[in-house]
Amino acid sequence: APAGLWHEQPPRKFPPSLDARILAKISQHFMKTAYRIPVLKAIGYKKITHLWRELSFESCRDSVIAMARSKGYMPMWHGANGRRFESVVPERVKLSVVFGDEDLTLPEEIAQEKSVAPAHSRWIVVDNCAHVIMWNYPELTVELIKKTALMAS
């Protein structure tokens, strides 16, 4: 979530993505095997989505490659940690804030403070959805993007 939506700041000094990047750098060399072994797939995805068993090989492969190549979130983490939104988002900028009701990475109780989102934003909670909506509902993701874009025209 944008740092401005956190109720509480995370207790960690380093972002959780650091663990994911290390795991991805190792597992990229045996992705097909890791995907087929439930315990290994669970290590990579169970903390992100309750629907981890349903993830396609393509989604897992793409996420492993992206995390393995990632430079990380440290610059953003250092810049945003402990901050709130500091400027007004003009109403002409249409935006939607989308969370899954099963988001284990950014749960509602610590990371979804609706009161600090721009007043004109659409707050959308997707049922039976985890942190990465495009993994669980790719068609709905496209639909939400199109709806938000149409609001701007």
Residue spans for each PLM region:
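Generic structural signal for small/hydrophobic residues in well-ordered secondary structure
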Residues: 1, 44, 97-100
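Flexible "cap/lid" loop of the alpha/beta hydrolase fold
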Residues: 1-29
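Alpha/beta-hydrolase active-site loop signature
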Residues: 4, 103, 130-133
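Short aromatic-enriched loop/helix-cap "lid" or pocket-rim segments at secondary-structure transitions
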Residues: 8-13, 108-111, 136-138
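Short helix-to-loop capping/linker segments positioned immediately adjacent to catalytic or ligand/cofactor-binding
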Residues: 29-34, 118
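Conserved alpha/beta-hydrolase catalytic His-Asp/Glu region
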Residues: 32-89
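Conserved serine/cysteine hydrolase catalytic core
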Residues: 69-116, 125
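Catalytic active-site module of serine/aspartate enzymes centered on a nucleophile-bearing elbow/loop
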Residues: 119-153
